[in-house]
C-alpha cells in the first residue's frame, strides 16, 4: 500500500471535502453553501480554499448581487485532473 502517491494537498480531510463537493456538480459553489455543507467556520474554510486556489486547483469569482457580494468557487481543469488522479490512486490502494 503506497500512500506516498496520494496528493497530500487533497488528502487533508477538509480539503478532500471541498474538492469532493466542487467535483460533484457542474455549477459553481457559493461560499456560504460550501460552509453549510462542510460545517466549517468562515476562517477555517477560507484558509483551505486559499490553499487550493494557490495550488491552481480551484478558482473563485466575487459577484455583486442582491445584498452582500458572494464568492463563487469551482475546480480548474488542473484541479479536476488532480482530484481524478487522487481517486485513481485511492482505488488502486483499495484494490479496486
Give the ranges of each region predicted by the language model.
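Amphipathic alpha-helical dimerization/coiled-coil segments
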Residues: 1-3, 81-96
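Beta-hairpin "wing" of winged helix-turn-helix
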Residues: 53-69
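Aromatic side chains
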Residues: 31, 57, 73, 83-86
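Short, hydrophobic-biased segments on the C-terminal half of alpha helices
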Residues: 49-50
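N-terminal helix-turn-helix DNA-binding core of bacterial DNA-binding proteins
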Residues: 2, 6-44, 65, 72
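Amphipathic, soluble alpha-helical interaction motifs
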Residues: 19, 55, 63, 85, ...
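Basic, amphipathic "hinge/linker" alpha-helix immediately C-terminal to the N-terminal HTH DNA-binding motif
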Residues: 65-84
Amino acid at each position: 500500500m503506497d500512500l506516498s502517491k496520494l496528493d497530500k494537498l487533497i488528502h487533508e480531510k477538509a480539503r478532500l471535502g471541498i474538492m469532493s463537493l466542487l467535483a460533484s456538480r457542474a455549477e459553481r459553489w457559493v461560499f456560504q453553501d460550501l460552509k453549510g455543507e462542510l460545517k466549517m467556520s468562515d476562517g477555517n474554510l477560507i484558509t483551505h480554499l486559499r490553499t487550493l486556489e494557490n495550488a491552481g486547483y480551484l478558482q473563485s469569482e466575487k459577484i455583486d448581487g442582491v445584498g452582500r457580494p458572494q464568492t463563487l468557487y469551482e475546480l480548474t481543469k488542473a484541479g479536476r485532473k488532480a482530484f481524478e488522479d487522487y481517486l485513481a490512486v485511492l482505488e488502486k490502494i483499495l484494490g479496486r
